Amino acid sequence: MNTSITARELFDQQRDKLALRWVAGQKGEHREIQAGSNNARRPSLAGYLNVIYPNKVQILGTEELAWLDSLDARQRWETIEKIIQVQPLALAISKNQSCPEDLGAAADESNTPLWISPKRGHELLNHLSYHLARTLAPRVTLHGVFMEIYSIGVLITGEAGSGKSELALELLSRGHRLVADDAPEFTQIAPDVLDGTCPELLQDLLEVRGLGVLNVRDMFGDTAVKKNKYLRLIVHLTRPMTEPTPSGYERLTGDSGSRHVLDLDVPLITLPVMPGRNLAVLTEAATRLHILRTKGIDPAAMFIARHSNLLERRTP
């Protein structure tokens, strides 16, 4: 999913938090940056003024403006030209410093957004870098019900009619929490972290066949809903056409594997849906098993080791 942000969107989203004022280049509000590929040579999203390797948002603090003032007229004009020519998303001046007239005029002429904030330079840098990184991070929407079970994020997937929503409802009644139903959105906010959230349209809602749309917050209380959670496990529900006949190894280890989501392989456990099986209990057990495995505890491996030791002791 391609993501982008315009200068106007960034300004509106950060105006109150950073007390931003738009002082020049208002016609450049439609300037846009898009999520780029993982390229070490691409420009930084935000940073202090850099003419050689320009940032997408150039921050001018006390030292940067003092450096501009130290240049002679010709060097100053050439430097401002270089700043403008690379077409940054915006320029941001910290500490409510006055905007130099020539810089403001160049911003207006080139339609380069220029903002002023009372925040210090490093505060602007931290806020803008974090916000841009989150906004432009790779993201994907998956079909399923995303829940918090035993404090970890679990995505329940399966074909239509496999019982995902009914399972989610049972888990809610057992004290677990809903993040998103039907279309949770996952963002890769770090090399090994997928953050799952709910689209605004579906917030607090769970659709169950026969009951329609339920408001989980109203039915179970505020604590039954979670704003976001990191994805750690996928539980996939499958409906076998015939009685499954797992191999001996699968009987020991279960039907586990992984699913590739963005750049990560997420652990996956498959649970067959059959009459008489308590899927809520099985999903809780699968989650507990995953937690144990992350701690290096594998019951199947322990049993295999015990069995091997027993055979060795009994072998003459």
UniProtKB/Swiss-Prot annotation:
Organism of origin is: Xanthomonas oryzae pv. oryzae (strain KACC10331 / KXO85)
InterPro entries (alphabetical): HPr(Ser)_kin/Pase, Hpr_kin/Pase_C, Hpr_kin/Pase_Hpr_N, P-loop_NTPase, Ser_kin/Pase_Hpr-like_N_sf
One example GO MF annotation: protein serine/threonine kinase activity
- Spell out the protein name for this chain: HPr kinase/phosphorylase
Q: Where does Mg(2+) bind?
A: 165, 207
Its UniProt miscellaneous note says: Both phosphorylation and phosphorolysis are carried out by the same active site and suggest a common mechanism for both reactions.
Taking the record's annotation, the residue ranges forming a coiled coil are: none
Purpose of the protein: Catalyzes the ATP- as well as the pyrophosphate-dependent phosphorylation of a specific serine residue in HPr, a phosphocarrier protein of the phosphoenolpyruvate-dependent sugar phosphotransferase system (PTS). HprK/P also catalyzes the pyrophosphate-producing, inorganic phosphate-dependent dephosphorylation (phosphorolysis) of seryl-phosphorylated HPr (P-Ser-HPr).
The ranges of region (Important for the catalytic mechanism of dephosphorylation) come to 272-277
Q: Does the keyword Iron-sulfur apply?
A: no
**Alphabetic keyword roster:** ATP-binding, Kinase, Magnesium, Metal-binding, Multifunctional enzyme, Nucleotide-binding, Serine/threonine-protein kinase, Transferase
Protein's GO biological process: regulation of carbohydrate metabolic process
Similarity-based family: Belongs to the HPrK/P family.
